[in-house]
Amino acid sequence: MPTINQLIRKKRQSSASRKKSPALQKCPQRRGVCLQVKTKTPKKPNSALRKVAWVRLSNGQEVIAYIGGEGHNLQEHSIVLVQGGRVKDLPGVRYHIVRGALDCAAVKNRKQSRSRYGAKRPK
């Protein structure tokens, strides 16, 4: 417990809240280049091979981003758009790649939740 004199000399510091997506630096999305595209296995009760990409953003930071949807066309040197949003069962994956933007193709034959996957309205 500090004394009153100590509090006068140095005020109490309010703890800054932790940012959920610090690499975006308050931007809604950022452009980046894929360094490698791999699969990761999820945390304990789940089992799958989730597709992720290591991306170097336009601000120079490197992040791991999740590639949503069934099938993708990404490879090394692909230009992608990255937005915030973690994947609950993949530790360290705090970003999503936007489907249907830049080099990342939209999901084919998608009928529902199309806007999330960049799919056009079927005729």
From Swiss-Prot:
Basic residues bias: start-end ranges: 8-21
Gene3D superfamilies, sorted: Nucleic acid-binding proteins
Keywords from the named record: Methylation, Ribonucleoprotein, Ribosomal protein, RNA-binding, rRNA-binding, tRNA-binding
Superkingdom per UniProt: Bacteria
GO biological process, one term: translation
Location of the region described as Disordered in the Swiss-Prot/TrEMBL record: 1-29
GO cellular component: small ribosomal subunit
PANTHER family linked to this entry: 30S RIBOSOMAL PROTEIN S12 FAMILY MEMBER
Similarity comment text for this entry: Belongs to the universal ribosomal protein uS12 family.
Subunit and interaction comment: Part of the 30S ribosomal subunit. Contacts proteins S8 and S17. May interact with IF1 in the 30S initiation complex.
UniProt function note: With S4 and S5 plays an important role in translational accuracy. Interacts with and stabilizes bases of the 16S rRNA that are involved in tRNA selection in the A site and with the mRNA backbone. Located at the interface of the 30S and 50S subunits, it traverses the body of the 30S subunit contacting proteins on the other side and probably holding the rRNA structure together. The combined cluster of proteins S8, S12 and S17 appears to hold together the shoulder and platform of the 30S subunit.
Protein name: Small ribosomal subunit protein uS12
Annotated organism of origin: Chlamydia felis (strain Fe/C-56)
Gene of this entry: rpsL
